[in-house]
């Protein structure tokens, strides 16, 4: 009986890893497509602080263009829909976290960055 539970648990872990990997690949494709589309439009500017001339593929740098979920996933925002994406600098994306756009725009952090 215990072997059945162990086997079932192992299968669930494997299934979860497979699903997570597929979801990660889907997110990376959506993110890259959105950023490339925005770059072609000439709009790689942070939606929140207005920092311009952001770059793609500069991981972790202040000038890195990232994709933020306008309506946070935790608040029911669509994870893969470009209609829920905005271009955002790395700093703002890290700071915003699960805040709503209005909460973040009203924060002292953004007020200081914009001034």
Regions found by a protein language model. Give the residues of each.
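Mixed-charge, low-complexity interaction segments
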Residues: 2-4
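Short, charged surface segments at domain edges that flank catalytic/cofactor-binding sites
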Residues: 7-51
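Alpha-helix C-capping/helix-to-loop hinge sites
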Residues: 37, 73-74, 92
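Cys/His-rich metal-chelating microdomains
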Residues: 49-55, 91-95
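Histidine-centered nuclease catalytic patch
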Residues: 52-85
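Short edge-strand/loop segments of extracellular domains
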Residues: 71, 109-112
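Short Cys/His-centered divalent metal-binding micro-motifs
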Residues: 85-107
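Charged phosphate-binding loop/patch that engages nucleotide di/tri-phosphates or the phosphate backbone
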Residues: 106, 114-115
